[in-house]
Every structure is written in structure tokens, then in C-alpha cells.
Amino acid sequence: MQFEWINFYSEFASKLLSFKNDRKSLISKINAVYAAIDMKVPKLESGDEIIDIDPFTIFGLFNKGITNANRIAIIGSIAKEFGIEAKVPDNFDGIPVLNNLKATFYGFKDDRKEDDIDNIWNVFEAAIALADEDNEANRAEFSKWYDLVHDQLCIRWNLTMGLYWIRPYSFINLDSRNRWYLTNVENMPAEFVDAVKSKINKLPNAADYLFVKDSCMTALNEGSYEYKNYPELSYYAWMISEQVNQEDVYKRQGYNERPAYWKNKISIRRSYA
């Protein structure tokens, strides 16, 4: 299965890394992105002016509960402002999105610690390095910054979502849908479920997160699943969870089973996935 957003997201993440030590210029560019499409910059600080920002919060600007039309408009403006060569996507299958009311990865100025945003940049940089070359040194560097960020204000499962956005073939997203899907023996091997279930009851530390992602990839490589990588898994988890939610609606309405047209729709989507 092809995910056209991956090339754009990966290239944009690499572009953002060059602004790690030049955030004033980055903030100017973000303001320009919104000005070009006549949209208001979302509230990212206690006042109206952006003081500082991290790369995952920037990704969150177009990965939250907004319309696809607005998402495409923002991404298109980003492409022009940052010189992104990858095609601007118009399909976003397999992408987890943030709650609009919890869309920053940091607390506002009076609530966050001095190094909070710097720490997020550091785990962002370490994640890209680890995705580029998976070795012990890069794992240690990633783990150091991940564990620092893990305990910061406003960091929840969104940390795993951010890692997935920037390098989706290297990092697993552990949003609620994926956690639900991964811990069901109908979807993953029983030994995998037993090994990871207790590790994802709450946001895992770096060692547990790396264990979950590595164990998942091993299971996908060794099993005969329709999903062979994290993006396919994420998409499939979304698709099946939507099916289950719809079944619950029908049951509450007094139906014994889904209407035939819905069965056919699910069957078609399963074969596509």
C-alpha cells in the first residue's frame, strides 16, 4: 500500500532540523505560511506572539482535527515557504491526529521549564539520526532525550505520534487505536501481546518504547499479515476500529448485524489494505 504523505512529511522533518538553532527564522516562516493562505495562526502561547516552538508542535498544526481542505492548504503553503520538493499529499491514510485542545507539545511560557522545548528538539534530532542509522550510540542518544521529554508537561502519547509523523517506517505510533489493536491476539501474535501489553498501559520509557517497536517489526516480518510496516498497521488499526465502532452503533439501534452494504464496504477496504 502506498502512502503519499510519507515523502512530504519526511522531507519536511529534515528541513525543520536545520532550524534547531535558528528558531526566530522558523517562527517567521510559520507566520508567513498562515499569512499566505489568509488563515490565523493557532494559539501556541499564552499571548498572541509565538516565543518559541518545537518541531512536533509544527507538525501538529496540520495533524489535528481540521478539515482536509485546510490541511492541504497549510501543507501547500509549507511546501512553498520551505522549498519542499515532495508532492503535496491530498490523502492522509494512516496518520494519527491530535486533539485540537491539546495540540502543543509544551506548556505555555509560565508553565514550562526553561529547557522543555530544547529537549524536544534534541529528541527530534536524535530520532532522525536513529532512523538514518540504527546503532547502539544512536539508540543511547535517542533514549537519553526521549526519557527527559517523557516527563515534561503536555507530553503524553503524542510523543509517539510525533516520532511516527517524522519517520513513519522507523517509529511506531502508540495512539489509542494502535494500542487497542496491538493488544488483540486476533491481530498480533499471542507472545507479542503478552510481551508488550503491560508496557503500553501508560506512556513507555525509552527502553520499553524501543522494545515495543522492535518486537512489533519482528512480528510483522515473521508473520503473514496484510500489514508489513508501521504505516500499514496504523491504517489497518484505524479501519478496523471504525468497523467496530459502527457495529456498536448498529447494536445500540437494535440491529443484530450490520446491513449487507456495510459488510461489502468493509470487505472491499480490507482487501485494499
List the model feature ranges, each with a label.
Residues 159-166:
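Short hydrophobic alpha-helical segments that form membrane-spanning helices or hydrophobic packing faces
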